[in-house]
């Protein structure tokens, strides 16, 4: 579905067009703020390798963790890449695009609040900036480096912590975004962390999305 035609999202799913549009808009906002700034995007965020992609061993095994009742997430922690970030609810704009966290708060992670709560049955979606208008790393700059099995912890408003394990990390061209694969679920509590990534051009912004797939493994 074309971004301009998407106006709403069901509670348990997120429009891929919306997320991709949000990334394009974020990159465009950087250009509006900075004009032509050759130094900002000389490098690019880390890209996941083929070893981090899905394989037979990447699918969940072992006991199933009982889903939690809904509760808002308040903090995201990924010790492996030094992330310890507050979370805020984000929604869709009038065009159906997922609103990223405020541009002035690159250390803030956003949770799609009209979707699944992290730890509940279904696929929860969190997003964050990969970088800032001045080229500094954002909260999700290093998502592309996460290895399988890496722990992701989300502290919730009910004082429980949903603990997830990374199953795979993949980079998708935004023109070939596999929405069913990304937003679909296995029936277990799952998590997706999504940010902009891939190549970057001053005309179109980032050309892809880095997606982290994770499954609930424990509750503390």
Residue ranges and their predicted role:
Residues 26-147, 155-160, 168-220:
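Solvent-exposed, non-transmembrane regions of membrane-associated and secreted proteins
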């Amino acid at each position: 579905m074309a971004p301009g035609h998407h106006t709403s999202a069901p509670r348990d799913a997120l429009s891929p067009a919306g997320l991709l549009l949000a990334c394009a808009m974020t990159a465009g906002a950087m250009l509006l703020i900075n004009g032509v700034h050759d130094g900002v995007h000389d490098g690019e965020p880390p890209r996941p390798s083929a070893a981090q992609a899905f394989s037979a061993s990447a699918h969940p095994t072992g006991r199933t963790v009982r889903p939690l009742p809904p509760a808002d997430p308040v903090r995201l922690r990924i010790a492996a890449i030094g992330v310890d970030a507050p979370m805020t609810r984000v929604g869709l704009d009038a065009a159906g695009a997922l609103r990223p966290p405020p541009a002035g708060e690159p250390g803030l992670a956003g949770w799609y609040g009209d979707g699944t709560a992290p730890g509940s049955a279904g696929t929860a979606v969190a997003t964050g900036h990969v970088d800032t208008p001045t080229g500094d790393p954002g909260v999700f700059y290093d998502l592309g480096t996460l290895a399988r099995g890496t722990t992701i912890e989300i502290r919730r408003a009910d004082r429980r912590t949903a603990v997830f394990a990374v199953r795979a990390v993949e980079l998708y061209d935004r023109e070939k975004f596999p929405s069913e694969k990304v937003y679909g679920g296995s029936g277990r509590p799952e998590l997706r962390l999504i940010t902009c990534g891939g190549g970057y051009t001053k005309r179109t912004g980032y050309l892809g999305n880095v997606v982290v797939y994770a499954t609930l493994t424990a509750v503390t």
